[in-house]
């Protein structure tokens, strides 16, 4: 993706340095980064911005029942081990539930293609000889940047699932075990991934199916600010090329998606409003080594042994930038106990109103029937009720 006009974390740091009349050392010794991070969260998580809506697709998997299983409660290679003969445990088995003799058991871990373990509180309690079984899946991990979503839609039938509470889902899970076409969905904490949510459907699909939904994603995190190791050494790139070669650089895999700016042989590049505006900037597409990366798109000109910076892009809609800048000034005023906190807040509040207005891209009325569910399970109209 080309990056001709992106605002970066570096720009926000530099802005607060100017705002506070600080020097380079102050970038380390003042709460500049804390103010930026706080303002970023406060503004961007305080509203369901249209800019952050994205589509996500979940492949729903059919139950699996090939072969037979033997359950070894204790003393085997693993405690509570379920061994499969005549088949292969699906790669998704860690999220599965196993039915044996009409009873549902929770999977703890997939150990190999033929071995998995059941949880301590959900198992037969004693050894079970070779027997038929079925394993199914109703729990699917949400994207790592998930904040909230609309109800999902099944692709094959274009039917929308109905939201129910986790407690209602639990009752259905116990009472109705036949795989069919999912009708309901809810949200739970992901059982295998910390700080992640999972969508749970009922019933499990009987045949493989795809499900889509629109969700509210989180903005990209801010980690790299163009200072320290993100400006060490020099870089070289040919005209109309994407391959960047560094000298004494420390490129990282985590720099993928960040913005690299090219300066001159004598000057480290700044933002447009700085003393040494960058010559070109592009996002980083791939990482090869500490001295080799490739850009997402080609640069126009050649650069030989020039200074550079790498910084994370500010993942906001352009109409929100002014509010973010006023927000970091306000947070900085709080953290440094400045006397003009109230004035900074007034400017921030006014800028937020303008940002909200810029977020209304569509003139059509919105109704309270348009509901967004986030990870705690609340609902919220996406705009003014159309009464």
Language-model region placement:
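Short glycine/serine/proline-enriched coil/turn segments at secondary-structure junctions
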Residues: 251-252
